Amino acid sequence: SNKEFKDSSELLNTLPFYTGHAQIFITSVDLIIENPLIGKGIKSYRNNCFSIMHLPNRVCESHPHNYFLDILNDTGFLGLGLILVPVLILLLRVYKEYLKGEARNNNISNWIYLAIILSVIIQFFPFKSSGSFFSTFNSAYTFLIIGFLLGLNEIRSKSDK
């Protein structure tokens, strides 16, 4: 069909997979651009989004509904690095331990490792819509998984000695 749209939000609303998160993401990216290095402060999205509501396709919500956008908006690239670098280092170390475990044929331990690694990857999957990273429930769940991973890694490294 040759239907013309007044603005891109009209077009977005016609897409079968559109959930409305695109507008939240656009708003979040606009706010990140304003202060990319250190962000605007924890849980600041809900207060700062009103400043750009006059632009098309912008929506004000309580948080950006994506961990990466949430962290970038609140703490900037500096905060994202401080959060992601240790998590990535941990995942690499644990993955190396997981590979060592395959050689030892310790199947239960390997399945636990794999489940925890996948939980962390799924939790931080960049394109999924999520709650606020800095909310109590989401942070508790994330750091609980990371704690399990650290504990399991410590147990495995001690058993190798």
Q: What are these model-derived regions, one by one?
A:
Residues 1-6:
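Aromatic-rich transmembrane-lumenal/periplasmic boundary elements in polytopic membrane proteins
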Residues 38-41, 58, 81, 133-137:
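Short, hydrophobic secondary-structure boundary micro-motifs
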Residues 75-124:
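Hydrophobic transmembrane alpha-helices and their immediate junctions
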Residues 50-54, 99, 130, 149:
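A generic structural signal for secondary-structure junctions
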Residues 11-13, 63, 105-109, 128:
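Short coil/turn segments at secondary-structure junctions
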Residues 39-43, 76-79, 115, 147:
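Glycine-centered flexibility sites
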Residues 86, 114-161:
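Transmembrane alpha-helices of multi-pass inner-membrane enzymes
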Residues 9-34, 38-75:
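Long extracytoplasmic/lumenal interhelical loops at the membrane interface
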